[in-house]
Amino acid sequence: MVLSTEENRSVDLVNLPSVPLPDGEAGVGENNKDSLNNLCSQYEEKVRPCIDLIDSLRALGVEQDLALPAIAVIGDQSSGKSSVLEALSGVALPRGSGIVTRCPLVLKLKKLNQGEEWKGKVTYDDIEVELSDPSEVEEAINTGQNHIAGVGLGISDKLISLDVSSPHVPDLTLIDLPGITRVAVGNQPADIGRQIKRLITNYIQKQETINLVVVPSNVDIATTEALSMAQKVDPDGDRTIGILTKPDLVDRGTEDKVVDVVRNLVCHLKKGYMIVKCRGQQDIQEQLSLAEALQKEQVFFKEHPQFRALLEDGKATVPCLAERLTMELISHICKSLPLLENQIKESHQSTSEELQKYGADIPEDENEKTLFLIEKINAFNQDITAIVEGEEIVREKECRLFTKLRKEFFLWSEEIERNFQKGSDALYKEVYTFEMQYRGRELPGFVNYKTFENIIRRQIKTLEEPAMEMLHKVTEIVRAAFTTVSEKNFSEFFNLHRTTKSKLEDIRLEQETEAEKSIRLHFQMEQIIYCQDQIYRKALQKVREEEAEEEERKHGKSRSSQSKNLQTSSMDEIFQHLNAYRQEAHNRISSHIPLIIQYFILKMFAEKLQKGMLQLLQDKDSCSWLLKEHSDTSEKRRFLKERLARLAQAQRRLAKFPG
């Protein structure tokens, strides 16, 4: 909230805007304390529920699944970041040289009613440390960092949570991130700078995060690493707030430049800048209390000739910053809730679907385990039946097995046609040779039946190997389909899946051999030239009519009725008989070979596989072995169940939120 000039003029040492005040701090009058307790009073009814909602979702672990609205605090080392957080929270945080914040620290501030006692809690991993005094905070956080990141200067991306409840803090949640460093010092890892930047980027790149960039007033803001990192992930500055610190260290004569930065005239950010003056190292050595530091800050800005205007604009002091951050966080949460609700719903649905793939937990009881295996095998057999009947459920852009087989059978029909067409030239030459060289006592127009048989046999024989190729192709397609069913049902049970694949391979080999025998037998039978008389007559009549129509189309009725020479007429007669028989052979072979393949490679393959799977149930001793899972399957199932429970609880909390 930007305070009006009149509002700011009323701000004095006795009537500060509400700010955090550490319990037990001396030197502040009762009127001042009453004034300090007014922080966010105008928001109180809606502020706490909003922040509590997000904090509760974060405590559930929902942040493992999706991003939550947050304010992340970043800054270079020695930027004054810790001092700002101390001023906001009223507790002393770890200080020192080098990397002090070694784990992300979630600082949850909760405003209590006047008279209630200060409470604190530090949480990390499965450890909770209750605190009864603000002075215990620093040691508890250092202990937590040593536990998570190890004793030394290493860092970790695991969270430490600090809950502070007091009448003298704002309702606010911040995430403090390690200070940016460039050079490894002492026993720090050589790539410590890169590690810290990666950790910071993981937080500030999320669209749900407001980035609070802390920069000393006495440096060139355009060259600071923290602002540069924020600009990379938020180039328009839509979710970045700049905080200038250490205004008392600004060189004389450069104050106007600092004022220009705060007024957003140098590096533009849509959310703008604030400026604060917190305790410095000398103040700490002189044991200046946080409450006294707030009074000292108020005096500094009120009496400073250049910075006074920033106080009047509501852009200076920790109290104004606390109020601004609370307002920003609440606004950000309210804007994010609809999207967050949808994300939780979608994540819940996708997690449920993924959990279904892993199935239920394996029972411990042997009888129940047998029933579990029966259910699994029945489900597998039902899926196989659905494939054989062409009723399996497929995903978008996928096709059923029968669609794939139909395509292969269509190509087979085309292969027969292509084969006959390709043999026409050779056929003409052979018939011509017979007519000119080998015709015996036959009158013109009579075909030598032996020659007719030989021609037909040779042409049909050339189709045998293409039929074998189709058989192998279809077998592979069916094998792949059945293997997919096994993976779908048994992928988590490696022994059962392996046993199924072994059975599948044995039956495939057996059925492919049977199908090959049957196909070769069919081609042997095709060497017998035979067709029912009435069928052959119809085929011959059809060929003659088609040729007559074609002749009439080409040369007209008069030409077609003219007598042809005896040689041409005889050749035509032979070709008509050959074409008539080839058409009937085409019809037989194009249908019968796919029938053989479907019978052996689909129907019998499926039946034998299903029977083989049921036979597994006869050996009850192998039940546990067959149901042995991959080492990570039960862990994955447990993880998904926990996520599902988290998301379900999050949905319930969002549903209860008054909005």
From Swiss-Prot:
Q: Where are the transmembrane segments?
A: none
Pfam families per record: Dynamin_M (PF01031), Dynamin_N (PF00350), GED (PF02212)
Query: Would you kindly state one Gene Ontology biological process term found in this protein's UniProt entry?
Result: endosomal transport
Instruction: Cite the residue spans of the region called G1 motif.
Output: 75-82
Q: Where is this region: G4 motif?
A: 245-248
Range of residues in the leader sequence:
none
Q: Where in the cell is it found?
A: Cytoplasm
Residue span(s) of domain Dynamin-type G? 65-338
Chain spans, region G3 motif? 176-179
Q: Does the keyword Transit peptide apply?
A: no
Q: Where is this region: G2 motif?
A: 100-102
- Report residues binding GTP: 75-82, 176-180, 245-248
Induction behaviour: By type I and type III interferons.
Question: What InterPro entries is this protein classified in?
Answer: Dynamin, Dynamin_GTPase, Dynamin_GTPase_CS, Dynamin_N, Dynamin_stalk, G_DYNAMIN_dom, GED, GED_dom
By its UniProt entry, which SUPFAM superfamilies does this protein fall under?
P-loop containing nucleoside triphosphate hydrolases
Q: Where is this region: Disordered?
A: 547-567
Q: Where is this region: G5 motif?
A: 277-280
Mention one GO molecular function. Answer: microtubule binding
Q: Write the record's keywords in alphabetical order, separated by commas.
A: Antiviral defense, Cytoplasm, GTP-binding, Immunity, Innate immunity, Nucleotide-binding
Q: Which CDD domains match?
A: DLP_1
Query: What's this protein's name?
Result: Interferon-induced GTP-binding protein Mx2
Question: What is the phylogenetic placement of the source species in the record?
Answer: Eukaryota, Metazoa, Chordata, Craniata, Vertebrata
